[in-house]
Amino acid sequence: MEAKETHSISDHEVELQDAKPEEKSENGNFVFEKAFSSDEEKGSGYNTNETYSKMDNSLQHRGVSKIEAVRDSIYQNKRGMYLAYAFGIAILACSWASAIQSSTTYSYQVYATASFNRTSMISTLEIATAIISSVCKPILGKFSDITSRPMTYTLVLLFYVIGFIVVASSSTISAYVIGSVFISIGSSGLDYLNTLVVGDLTSLKWRGFMTALLSTPYIATVWFTGFIVQGIIDSNWRWGYGMFAIIMPAVMTPAVIILMYLERQANKDENIKKIINYQTEEKNKNKQSKWQKLWKAVLEVDLFGLILLGVGWSILLLPFSLTSYAKNGWKNPSMIAMMVVGGVILIAYSGYEMFIAPYPSCPRRVMNRTFITAVIIDFFYYLAGYLQSMYFTTYTWILYDWSYRDWTYFNNTMTIALCVFGVFAGAMHRVFHRYKYLQIIGLVIKIVGYGILIRPNFAATGKVDLAWSLILIGMGGSFSVVGSQVSCQASVPHQDLAIASSLLPLYTNIGGAIGAAIASPIFSNKVPKYLREYLPSSINDTQVYNFYSDSSLIREYPVGTEIRDGAIKAYSRSMFFLLVPAVSLSFIPLAAAFWQSNFYLGNQQNAVEGDQDHKKKGDKETTQEEKIII
């Protein structure tokens, strides 16, 4: 499978990846017709100064070759297709369990942190989990390339189980945070692997639809997770975490077994046997000790560089959420020192990646225009999104005397919109074979959704305003996210799919962490200030601090009382300072979207390699003898 070289861009030539594959049957193969000549189609899908050479494409890891063998084998006969459907059902079951877990445990955060008198620590938790889990994705991606996709699923399951056990048994806020980090790695790792496998096994025209389909369980789970939350909170929030230490292994094991079986069957193919024999010969020529193999694996996943990245961003951003607890706030030397050290570490990371790292976490070959634009769009999308959503559940908790169930329903409004319109966006990709303009429309809708929440000096408090804003934000967000995901995966060859699919959420989650870091000091400074201003003078400063630390105390006063109405006004005033920057920053991804490429979404696995169509029985086989497994 040899990569095609980049053509120069002129008035009469466009790059190969923007060519439209006409579905003409010729021994089962698809033929690329003449490329479109419009300016839109002339956009460079990848860096023209850095092509994917034959040597680059041949240096392929074992895990990539294994999943390619699976992809080829499932289209050869009905049995392979049935097994593929079974695997699809299995990962959909994983998505169901993950949807229930995230829909419920997100609501438990308020109660868990309140039990430790650390409600405002939610932002610190969000920063820590966002950065660490996102930094782990490139490691998981490289691990899946070096070993296999099933092996990585097993590793993710291990993180899941450990995290749930630690959180369920936590006696301090520190233990709760550590367990939450493990859960976040497991949850984000599962989502990442599901997305990666969908990218491995589907063509571009179905990519967005199938990826969005993995999120559809949220459409159903939202209606009964409220009952689960209500029942758990009435007894003990810890069991809400602990039960998933049993559920997740039960639902993930079938998916792992089926994928392992598919790999085993695919490895019986003669071409794969030749590759394995060649790899065995290479091993015999260059024998390495276990320590040498381990060191090579550490270098290949760029473990040192990713640790620098994660530690640097964590140390830089955590002071924003810790200043309210530090003596003298920003005047505390520790806060200043953390920011300085974090900045220095990030500079060191940049230098290490550019000049020292033998296997950079972000190789230059994937830094094409399409990928960079997708990163910019999602980076600011998440940054603005975290500004709006970080304390939005707490805000709605204060506004109305909803039951736990109804409160959970409302908090999942945006989730439902994201899932429903995500499938719609994927269907539009299948019908029109393009994604750019739908993404632009989505970003405009998202801005309108933010705007509905803003009133002069206050945030909206009406139920209709809140509901419509969440629906529009979810709708617009789904159009954008699905577009970024598809364009990112389309812009690189299959051998780089794992790294590109992990780097996009890495940088966008850093954007979310920055948004959380900005939201935390705004919330921690504004809420106590406005609580003191709008609460009756009969409430002393200690009570004000207690209301701020434990928002459930405010709920003890019915809506309409002087104390409750004063608290609502204080929270509404504070949310205004989060919503204004959120809507302002949302114009940046909108501008970037106009620079996005607009690949034709056809039968190919990606848009930069020519011979990428799924092979069916009777098709001419693609030789794999030139592939070398590292």
Swiss-Prot record:
Keywords: Cell membrane, Ion transport, Iron, Iron transport, Membrane, Phosphoprotein, Transmembrane, Transmembrane helix, Transport. Disruption phenotype: Impairs heme import into cell; simultaneous disruption of shu1 exacerbates the effect. Residues 1-51, 610-630 are annotated as: Disordered. GO terms for cellular component: membrane; plasma membrane. Residues 1-26, 611-630 have a biased composition (Basic and acidic residues). Its main location: membrane. It is a multi-pass membrane protein. The chain crosses the membrane at residues 80-100, 121-141, 155-175, 177-197, 209-229, 242-262, 303-323, 336-356, 371-391, 407-427, 440-460, 466-486, 503-523, 575-595. The modification Phosphoserine is found at residues 10, 38. Changing residue 552 to A: Decreases heme binding cellular heme import but does not affect localization to the cell membrane. InterPro entries: MFS, MFS_trans_sf. Residues 101-120, 176, 230-241, 324-335, 392-406, 461-465, 524-574 are extracellular. Induction: Induced in iron-deplete conditions (at protein level). Repressed in iron-replete conditions by transcriptional repressor fep1. Residues 522-576 are annotated as: Heme binding. The keyword Disulfide bond does not apply. GO terms for biological process: heme import across plasma membrane; transmembrane transport. One of its GO terms (molecular function) is heme binding. It is found in: Cell membrane. Residues 1-79, 142-154, 198-208, 263-302, 357-370, 428-439, 487-502, 596-630 are cytoplasmic. Low affinity heme transporter involved in the assimilation of exogenous heme during conditions of low cellular iron. Belongs to the major facilitator superfamily. This is Low affinity heme transporter str3. It comes from Schizosaccharomyces pombe (strain 972 / ATCC 24843) (Fission yeast). The lineage of its organism: Eukaryota, Fungi, Dikarya, Ascomycota, Taphrinomycotina. The gene is str3.
